Amino acid sequence: MPKKIVKGFTTNPSLMRKAGAKDYKSYSKKILKICNNKPVSLEVFADEYKQMKQQALQINTWGKNVYVKVPVANSRGIFMGKIIKELNNLNIKLNITAVYSAKQTEKILKLINKKTRVIISIFAGRAADTGKDPVPEFKKSISIAKKFKNVEILWASVREPYNFLQAKQLGCHIITIPPATIEKIENFGKTFDQLTKETVKAFLVDSKKSKFKI
């Protein structure tokens, strides 16, 4: 099942650093070689408009399956509407990331055309980490984006396998899932009795390895 649900690939500067990438371009090219027939989102890492645009234009040349990933705002909280609109008008496929609210989604939709493909990545897990329920933001974002056949809403920042079902139930077009979580999706469909048996077996294995005595 996990392999069947994988339809594309995305990364960001933080994940690249965690993966040990030393050279942005060569690392990205390796990804594109592996995922040559699937959509791949590659993120700019500049914080200023001019450099961000230069990077976006270059990244866009790396493949027809590339989505250029740009943040909805820079590190100072400045809305990146100008670059979003310009790149969209150049028919560059975009993945607009670090979105948290339907208000941000609405601002994006006011700028883009209705033909060039756009992904809006809403960070569910990080929002939930602060005690905020991301579901209402998804519901509203999905609703207002319905008029745009070229726009897909993405559930980002997954925290648990159940998020996969939540995203599907809400009508999200895409959900980004780390490999470890994809493997856990194999547990879907197991009965509570099966889970109890597996859990107790794990306790037994660990207690034997620990050589516990009372």
Task: Give short role names for the model-derived ranges.
Residues M1, K209-K213:
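Charged, compositionally biased N-terminal leader segments and the immediate start
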Residues Y24-K29, I34, Q58-W62, I84-E86, ...:
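Generic alpha-helical propensity signal that fires on short helical segments
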Residues I78, L90-E183, G189-S210:
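Catalytic alpha/beta core domains of metabolic enzymes, predominantly
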